[in-house]
Design a protein with these regions (language model features):
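Outer-envelope exported proteins of Gram-negative bacteria
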Residues: 1, 51-53, 90-92
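A short, structured active-site edge motif that brings together acidic residues
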Residues: 1-8
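Surface-exposed, active-site-proximal loop segments in enzymatic domains
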Residues: 9-27, 158-161
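Active-site mouth loops of central-metabolism enzymes
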Residues: 18-34, 62-66
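Short, acidic/polar
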Residues: 29-43, 94-101
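Active-site groove signature of glycoside hydrolases
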Residues: 39-63
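Beta/alpha (TIM)-barrel catalytic core signal, keyed to glycine-rich beta->alpha loops juxtaposed to Asp/Glu
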Residues: 57-251, 261-273
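Cysteine/selenocysteine-centered motifs that mediate thiol-based redox chemistry or coordinate metal-sulfur cofactors
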Residues: 253-256
Length: 273
């Protein structure tokens, strides 16, 4: 599985200009898209790509008509699938509404929503997951640990004291949820990563989870956690109740907030930020 959106070779300079130039030709040029596909084949040493996706389809440089699921990139993916160069075509990104709109077109086989679910919230269940179920689209969740949000990886109650003074009600909901999540971790003896991985497994609509890891040991731990299967019904029910406590900051805002607050933890021992 791979994606297009970071173009290779002579397209690289053109991509660098897209911050200022939203109609960059690389994103609507099927010749350059084919170059990206062929390069991926070479890197993967495969004659056929199992899944080929559009990276961040909400980027304006793709010039996609979301309502009607039209655009040069979509046309290219459909043609590549017809020609047998790819088996399945998909989407990956952060904008769950845009992903939902495109999934509803029935043109796609696969979607990877980044940061769309954690122990705190699961916004992809508002619109995206129902659309995927309706249209038979496979889901690979990206970043269930909150995109390396430290208080979702390491149970350190000092984070609660750092978050409590913040007046945003969405942050206070995070505190309320973390208190119960940490208590559940204490009661079950399960680490936050294991709770997360097995909680996601409880959701049959999600085919796989791209958890991410910084060390080989993390990969081994994640595999071991997944091997234990879904959480027991009572533990799952408690996490579902925690989800209902209230709206939280979006996960990317929480991640960025944690990067600011971590400087106040002189002896923080969790994952690297």
């Amino acid at each position: 599985s791979t994606k297009m959106g970071y173009f290779e070779g002579t397209v690289r300079e053109e991509y660098a200009n897209t911050v200022r130039q939203t109609d960059a030709k690389a994103f609507v040029d099927p010749v350059k898209m084919m170059r990206a596909l062929k390069h991926s084949m070479w890197l993967l040493q495969k004659d056929v790509i199992d899944i080929f996706s559009i990276h961040e389809p909400d980027w304006p440089q793709w010039q996609i008509d979301y309502e009607h699921a039209r655009g040069a990139a979509i046309d290219f993916l459909l043609e590549a699938k017809r020609e047998g160069l790819v088996r399945s075509i998909g989407l990956g990104g952060w904008d769950y509404h845009v992903l939902s709109q495109l999934v509803k077109s029935g043109k796609f086989d696969f979607v990877l929503p980044a940061g769309g679910m954690s122990l705190l919230s699961k916004p992809i269940y508002d619109e995206l997951i129902p659309a995927c179920v309706q249209h038979g689209v496979g889901v690979a969740l990206g970043g269930g640990f909150g995109q390396n949000t430290p208080f979702l990886i390491t149970k350190d109650r000092r984070w609660l004291e750092l978050l409590r003074p913040l007046e945003d009600e969405r942050v206070q909901n995070v505190v309320r949820k973390l208190e119960r999540i940490y208590r559940l971790s204490d009661e079950t003896g399960l680490s936050l990563p294991e709770l997360t991985i097995r909680y996601i497994i409880n959701h049959e609509e999600i085919a796989t989870h791209v958890a991410g890891a910084r060390e080989i040991a993390h990969i081994r731990q994640n595999v071991e956690s997944a091997g234990r299967g879904p959480l027991a019904p009572d533990v799952f029910r408690e996490l579902e109740e925690i989800q209902k406590i209230g709206e939280c900051l979006p996960i990317w805002d929480l991640r960025d907030l944690s990067r600011k607050l971590v400087k106040k933890l002189a002896h923080y021992t969790g994952g690297k930020i």
